[in-house]
């Protein structure tokens, strides 16, 4: 009985630590991408071309379905459109919304394809029918990781929501005075890249802070200190 309770506590603790580790990794990668925007754009562009080439080779060599492969290539063309305004993206833009739909449909169609093991009705009583080779778990997981999830996940980490902020003191010193300061001595706002991953993580963190306040706990965001 006690051992079972310990196993539940260990499972929950492991899940929480895993979630925090993934969130920390996403936060770090998002900050890293913000500092190296142009190399990230080139990497994503080449990755999209490479995955399209892989899909074509799978069609020719492994007999993947033509229509589904063509649909996946069309999805990657849609993903590529997000790079035109990289790293900034509008969450209500048609391209971004269409990309979200493509991610869901592409995952669903490929999952259905690999999970379909039924024999076609016209071949059920054919003794010479050779069923399609069923892919192993490693093959399916690798295909989904590289050809289905990699680019959407990379775009989620790399793309940024525009946020208008005041320029820093060093930026004001290095930039021209007429460009940074208006005639009314009011500093102009500039657009800063804020990664979508950071936006999501910060939103979740703020929600946890507000939820803790409801139960009478005060978390100071500057020091992450919990006070009653």
Curated annotation (Swiss-Prot):
This is Protein SVP26. The chain crosses the membrane at residues 2-22, 43-59, 89-105, 143-166. Interacts with itself. Interacts with KTR3, MNN2 and MNN5. InterPro entries: Svp26/Tex261 (IPR007277). Belongs to the SVP26 family. The keyword Protein biosynthesis does not apply. It is a multi-pass membrane protein. The gene is SVP26. It comes from the Eukaryota.
């Amino acid at each position: 009985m006690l051992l079972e309770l310990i196993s539940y506590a260990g499972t929950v603790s492991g899940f929480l630590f895993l979630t925090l580790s993934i969130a920390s990794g996403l936060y770090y990668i998002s900050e890293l991408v913000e500092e190296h925007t142009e190399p990230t754009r080139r990497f994503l562009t080449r990755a999209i071309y490479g995955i399209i080439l892989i899909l074509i080779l799978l069609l020719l060599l492994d007999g993947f379905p033509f229509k589904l492969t063509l649909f996946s290539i069309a999805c990657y063309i849609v993903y590529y459109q997000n790079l035109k305004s990289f790293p900034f993206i509008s969450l209500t833009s048609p391209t971004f919304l269409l990309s979200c739909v493509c991610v869901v449909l592409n995952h669903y169609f490929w999952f259905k394809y690999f999970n379909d093991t039924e024999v076609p009705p016209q071949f059920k009583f054919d003794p010479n029918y050779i069923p399609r080779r069923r892919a192993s778990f490693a093959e399916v997981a690798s295909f989904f990781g590289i050809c289905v999830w990699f680019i959407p996940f990379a775009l989620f980490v790399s793309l940024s929501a525009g946020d208008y902020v005041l320029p820093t003191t060093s930026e004001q010193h290095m930039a021209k005075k007429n460009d940074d300061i208006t005639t009314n001595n009011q500093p102009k706002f500039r657009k800063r890249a804020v990664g979508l991953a950071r936006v999501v993580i910060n939103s979740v963190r703020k929600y946890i802070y507000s939820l803790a306040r409801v139960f009478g706990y005060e978390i100071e965001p500057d020091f992450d200190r919990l006070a009653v």
